[in-house]
Amino acid sequence: MAKQSMKAREVVRVKLAEKYRAKREELKAIISGVNSSDEDRWDAVLKLQTLPRDSSPSRQRNRCRQTGRPHAFLRKFGLSRIKVREAAMRGEIPGLKKASW
């Protein structure tokens, strides 16, 4: 199990990313825009740097919904490999069965 503080930190990152999403997209459009002047680009870069660090979506980490484990995360299920295996063995995931050959 992950520490509660790590799970809470991840929740804060998700909220911040959603809060600043529109502003971040607007600034990035100015930076990558062909018609923007160099001064506008520089101002946009400086404004982007003033945004909170955790508002960037790349700082978010996929975590298991049950345990908070950050590694071996399977996006399709939202769980770690360990919890997917446990659920599959109990037959809780429709259409998923253990391979045998």
Swiss-Prot record:
InterPro entries referenced in this protein's UniProt entry, alphabetically: Ribosomal_uS14 (IPR001209), Ribosomal_uS14_bac/plastid (IPR023036), Ribosomal_uS14_CS (IPR018271)
Entry similarity comment: Belongs to the universal ribosomal protein uS14 family.
Keyword Ribonucleoprotein: yes
GO biological process, one term: translation
Protein name: Small ribosomal subunit protein uS14
Protein's job: Binds 16S rRNA, required for the assembly of 30S particles and may also be responsible for determining the conformation of the 16S rRNA at the A site.
One GO CC annotation: cytoplasm
Annotated signal sequence range: none
PROSITE patterns reported for this sequence: RIBOSOMAL_S14
Pfam families: Ribosomal_S14
Top-rank taxon, per record: Bacteria
